Amino acid sequence: MKTWVIKIGTSILRGTEETSTEEVIENLSRSFTSFLSKGNKLILVTSGAVGLGCQKLNIKTRPNDLSTLQATAAVGQVNLMSLYDKVFNRLGLNIAQILITKADFNSRESFNNASKTLKRLIDLNVIPIVNENDTVANEELKYGDNDTLSALVALAINANKLILLTDIENLYSKDPRNNKDAQPIKEVHNSELKEIKDKNIQNSNNEWGTGGISTKLISAEIATKGGVEVQLVDGTNKKNLIEIFNDNKIGTLFYPVEKPIGNKKSWLSHAIQTVGKITLDDGASFAIKKKGASLLAVGVKNVEGNFTINQAVKIVNTNDKEVAKGLVSISSDKLRSILNNKENNNSSIIVVHRDVLALS
């Protein structure tokens, strides 16, 4: 049995002058009926609420102010789920709406609860349709058009594959719309991905979405580090949808690492929000990166922010480059007290245990 997550971008769902949003959803749903009939499982991560809300309210360009964005998302979400329900019901498919914000993944308990709910839904042969809760989330509208969320969902349910449907055929060496010499990139191994991502080799400047190719590369990095294969595919081509579910190699394939970091450390690395920062000396940085050691107080040079036990912090080296994230074993006040020599014989105290420390 396979479990796949499919992220459908705004640029796909808005359709064209010839194809309505309902027809787009119809084409997609018909393409995976055979996949589901074999006992496989599917979760959709959908964008499009803001875009559809703007259509409904006759707003011609994507709003810039938060209140209008949230208002159009509220209107569009109703329309979006109505279309999904209408189309999927015709095919005898049951769906469920799941609205998520960053805060829902911020604690281990809530992350696990979301994971259990999603897994139970697919066990019941229900297709969960996940979207960010744009109506109440402010930071969420800058999250990357659901790209990052789709990777976290894939990790939460231990998916085999994450498919990113977009409006380009595959990843390119340059933006093909502005560079005639742009070369398609068909395969990317995890060891190559960070360099490609950091170069930000291409951006898709689509006003209706909040993400471009850069957010999809971030999503691919998150998923592949957690052991999930990622496929970037042009979802505007109906033939591609059929090819995907025949498991054919189209678009760009991002291969997962051979030794995934695991569900818990994936959560630490990508889902949790940090509340402070700890700067390490060179020795401590080497020890946690190369030896898998816990972070001890003796290796700490500086502390920023206020945090209590079990809150998440960013861990950086002397050049302020992120080394890891982790959950602290002591408070910021206690750690500052140790650094200021107000307490003796505490330099070997564990600040972040290696079991709750995830390398960046």
Swiss-Prot record:
Residue ranges annotated for the PUA domain, each copy included: 275-356
Instruction: Supply the source organism for this entry.
Output: Prochlorococcus marinus (strain AS9601)
Reactions catalysed? L-glutamate + ATP = L-glutamyl 5-phosphate + ADP
What cellular component terms from Gene Ontology apply here?
A: cytosol
- Known function: Catalyzes the transfer of a phosphate group to glutamate to form L-glutamate 5-phosphate.
Family the UniProt entry places it in: Belongs to the glutamate 5-kinase family.
EC primary class:
transferase
**InterPro entries named in the record:** AceGlu_kinase-like_sf (IPR036393), Asp/Glu/Uridylate_kinase (IPR001048), G5K_ProB (IPR041739), Glu/AcGlu_kinase (IPR001057), Glu_5kinase (IPR011529), Glu_5kinase/COase_Synthase (IPR005715), Glutamate_5-kinase_CS (IPR019797), PUA (IPR002478)
Q: Which UniProt keywords apply?
A: Amino-acid biosynthesis, ATP-binding, Cytoplasm, Kinase, Nucleotide-binding, Proline biosynthesis, Transferase
In terms of SUPFAM superfamilies, this protein maps to: Carbamate kinase-like (SSF53633), PUA domain-like (SSF88697)
**Where in the cell?**
Cytoplasm
Which pathway does this chain act in? Amino-acid biosynthesis; L-proline biosynthesis; L-glutamate 5-semialdehyde from L-glutamate: step 1/2
Q: Where does substrate bind?
A: S47, D134, N146
Residues noted as binding ATP in the record, renumbered to the chain = K7, T166, D167, T210, G211, G212, I213, S214, T215, K216
Record's Pfam families?
AA_kinase, PUA
GO:BP terms for this protein? L-proline biosynthetic process
Q: Does the keyword Nucleotide-binding apply?
A: yes
| Name of the protein in its database record | Glutamate 5-kinase
